[in-house]
């Protein structure tokens, strides 16, 4: 009988894309693969093209701020644990891999209740709430940054591995990307990535500066689901998408510079592709500040140009783009010196190792 694995993680693309990289490796090796995500999260849409069984469970959002919805979330989480536990009793996988996000916690606990080993992964410099809560129930947690070790008590559970990178991103075709947008080679391309859910501040800034931007660049704008601007359809030198999946590799290949949020998964993919970039981390007012930490780290290495979200204006962005283009060769060399590699093989080895280990006592 073939070994089996269940993946979980969702809420945003950053909690799904590393899973996609790993899923493809396990399927190559003949493993049975299934996925547990939230009922209405983006993970279902992203996993669907892989043609693997997807199971939706209830999940609470684990908010860090007051909301009346917080009163219902504990009940949703308990329901998610029960649903996950019943699924695991039926599926009986050898191991579970969790990429975090609010759906992950009930799934991890459900696996623990069924004595199924769990490996988790944290991409950011400081762990998210789901991974902090999940830590007592996992066998191993893989970290992208060594700095993340200080947040966990049991150091024997920790492996610093880096981040899995989708290999298909490294094989994009520049001409296909240009054709997809109706562009040519007359100007460099600027790729704007606001995250899978979009980024209102980035979208507004790009559109307010569009005339100046298109005088220097051809602009590819990934603006998020439901965030397209119909008034800008047909504007020369501007192409907008809600989200890019299979096309993303070609869009990256066509681009000379990238504007992005500073989630660790997206950032590592940008670095693996060697793209000069501007990072606009999510404000600490609406997040735990993880993206700010990521951005500051690479800014300190002289690799990333960073604009704080609260300071984002058209003139600030245009000046930052000039700075990046002026220092492009220097930035290129610094990115190459990092030698960013995918952690897929390392993490696959850890998962296989844990697939033959009993689950830990809660500590």
UniProtKB/Swiss-Prot annotation:
It holds the Pfam family Glyco_tran_28_C. One of its GO terms (cellular component) is plasma membrane. GO terms for biological process: carbohydrate metabolic process; cell division; cell wall organization; lipid glycosylation; peptidoglycan biosynthetic process; regulation of cell shape. It is an enzyme of class 2 (transferase). Its main location: membrane. It is a peripheral membrane protein. This is UDP-N-acetylglucosamine--N-acetylmuramyl-(pentapeptide) pyrophosphoryl-undecaprenol N-acetylglucosamine transferase. It comes from Legionella pneumophila (strain Lens).
